[in-house]
Amino acid sequence: MNDIYYAIASYHRPKCKTYHALKECGIEDERIVISLNDSNDFKTYVEALGSQAQIITRRGNNVASNRNNILNYFENGAKIILLDDDIRDFRKWEEKQGNKCGAQKKITELDKTFNEVFSFMQKNNIHFMGCLPTTNNMNIASYVKKGETYSFNTLVQGGLCFVIKSAEIKFDEKWDMLEDYELNLRMIRQGYIIARVNNIVPNKSLMGKEKGGMYDRYQRGEQQLWLRRLVKKYPDMVTKKDRTVLLKRKWRI
């Protein structure tokens, strides 16, 4: 099972930027799956993307149910890239010679780049990985300069995740937001290794700035509610700070 599958969770965004970003990189429709949270959107998506696009539906309440729909679509052991629907392109940090600053470079060979991550996962018995939640050059450079390509047992957002399908990876559908962080913390507590790749990032819309997706929830300020619930469920692991949560300590691997 060597193929990588690209799976997009989408809601009310028929233009689906991520689909077009994948096609620009030469990814075949046979390896792209778009899962709709609202089955009523099916016709609109087909009209926007064409009949060749693989579109699956399941009426669900939130992105957690949509991502589970994707996971249930594949067999155990499948290599899956879980994606948001608002990604313009994918980037990798490249260091420069001498004193020149490094820079983000657009990835064109996605399979080659992402296979390196999956190889790392297989060697280290890791089934779930993510990337940095920011495209800020200073943040990325700080990890690369330390030689820290990968971080372990930390929080990763769900916009670009690497999954080797297994039973323990299941989003809690009671969580309307922060379902990615909840899964991270639950797996760490259960003794699984979560990892983050620090030199690959998705170039995507700012959270809560583009209609569709999670836009309405962000506009209603629901994120603060779910941050508090996350801290309440995992008080020994995270603490709330402004609009996010921080790990209280480094968890062993």
Model regions and ranges:
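C-terminal catalytic/acceptor-binding lobe
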Residues: 4-5, 10-14, 175-253
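Short acidic, S/G/P-rich loop/turn micro-motifs used as interaction or catalytic elements
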Residues: 11-15, 40, 87-90, 136-138
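A structural signal for short, well-ordered beta-strand segments and their strand-loop junctions
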Residues: 79-84, 127-132, 194-197, 239-241
